[in-house]
Amino acid sequence: MVQSSEAHGPEGRGGQDPAPVRRARLSGSVRLPPGYEPALFLFTPRGEKLWAEGWDPRFPAPAGDDAEPGTVFETSHGQVRTTWVVSAREPGRSVRYARIAHGRDAGTVTVTLDGAGAATVEYDLTALTDEAATGLARFAARYPEFLQDWEQAIADAACQPPA
């Protein structure tokens, strides 16, 4: 469930795609399966592979601890290549990534466990082009469904036998 969201750009255009936004600050919660430990692992580069279809981080330098601040990795989604840097971590509680989706947007993603079976997921993104501002507006409008998809994928993965 999205707790709050804020997008900066022109006002909406009644019934059409959302108006382009240059910056979006989005926050919402994802419920986690009961007893899943360590829960923060689900939101590390390697841990996300357990539940995020198509997620395949590549590390340009060896990374024994993939959530160590300073760790760099890359992902691809369609034609968009994204470079990620672990910028902060509080072990067992939170992790923050800086990310640049080349030619599209840049910003941070922060995941914080609440200690009661949920994670708060915050995106703070800035569009790098006019075209990206339209895509960012669509992402912001769909953020609640985006997190619901995450929640369902995590729940489905928790029900799978270990590989």
What do these predicted ranges mean?
Residues 33-37, 87-92, 112-119:
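A short, structured loop/turn motif at beta-sheet edges
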Residues 31, 47-53, 58-101, 156-161:
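Glycine-rich portal/gate segments that line the openings of hydrophobic small-molecule binding cavities
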Residues 24-26, 71, 95, 109, ...:
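Short beta-strand micro-motifs in enzyme catalytic cores
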Residues 10, 160-163:
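Compositionally biased non-globular segments, especially hydrophobic aliphatic-rich helices
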Residues 2-65:
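Hydrophobic ligand-binding cavity/cleft-lining segments
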